[in-house]
Amino acid sequence: LQDLVERLGELPGFGPKSALRAALALLRMPRERAEALGGSILDLRRKLTFCSCCRALAACDPCPICADPDREDEVICLVGDLDSLISMEEGGFFHGRYHVLGGLLAPLDGVDASQLEIEPLRARLAKGLVRELVLAFGATLEAEATASHVKNLVAREFPEVAVSRLAQGIPLGAEVKHMDHETLRQSLVHRQKL
């Protein structure tokens, strides 16, 4: 039990208490369901691969998005991780291609550009099909560092590719009086004409 609790505790969002609760729930689960869950975890590692084009996890290579002939080849949405790609895709409003960096620059944590999927992105841009690269990162220091690095790389090596980023500011349904100062600053900087 302790071994399982420790392993579950390594997952994001699992502290010692939630890992213990999950382990106990697995113990109470009928044997067939627990074995099915274990099989699903094994299948996750065995059956998924990284798409050779966009670096997303998929059951096939190329992934369904890269294989879709109806997607726009001229626009790539650059995301830090698979979670971000899934969120963008669930919205149903982006019809271009994606590229997953596999993280963000985090010098304090020892994550530099060599650990990100920048070389495959560079290879895609070198083909000359892409006209715009949309940076879909959050508003963290790591996101800012990554955005700056990518923007500089593209400006230096692929000046014909426009670089844009998702707008930042006050979320829909929020009130100004409840916003932190940085969100208000970003909202003012990125204000739009009506």
Where would I find each of the regions flagged by the language model?
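Short functional micro-motifs and their immediate structural scaffolds
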Residues: 58-60, 71
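Extended interfacial segments that mediate partner engagement and assembly in macromolecular machines
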Residues: 19, 68-137
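Short metal-coordination and nucleic-acid-contact micro-motifs, chiefly zinc-binding Cys/His arrays
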Residues: 44-47, 59
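Extended, structured, electrostatic nucleic-acid-contact surfaces
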Residues: 1-12
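Short cysteine-rich clusters marking metal-coordination/redox-active sites
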Residues: 51-54, 63-66
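Long C-terminal interaction/binding lobes of large macromolecular proteins
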Residues: 3, 94-95, 122-194
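Short, ordered loop/turn segments at secondary-structure junctions
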Residues: 24, 82-83, 103-105, 138-140, ...
